[in-house]
Amino acid sequence: MEIIIYTMKGCGHCTRIKELIHRANVPYIEKKLDIDFTREELLEMYPKANGYPVMTVDGEFIGSLVESVKYFVEKGMVSSRK
């Protein structure tokens, strides 16, 4: 499973998604806005992206923080309680 998160500096939800992935105990790749990609490149790859963070799993667009939480809970990788 390859998880990639697209983040931007100063983004609180980006910090939270990294905490979520750590709870799931899975490796991930972080790509940072204006260092690893531009907003235009992200939208070209994932037109449904509408903010940060954006998470993909094996190239499949999952979404932002809320969708990512749902993904991990549905897969049984984290519980809905901390």
Give the location of each predicted region.
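Structural micro-motif
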Residues: Y46-T56, L65-V66
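Thioredoxin-like thiol-disulfide oxidoreductase module
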Residues: K32-A49
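Local sequence-structure signature of Cys/Sec-based thiol-disulfide redox active-site neighborhoods
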Residues: M1-V26
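C-terminal alpha-helical interaction module
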Residues: E2, L43, R81-K82
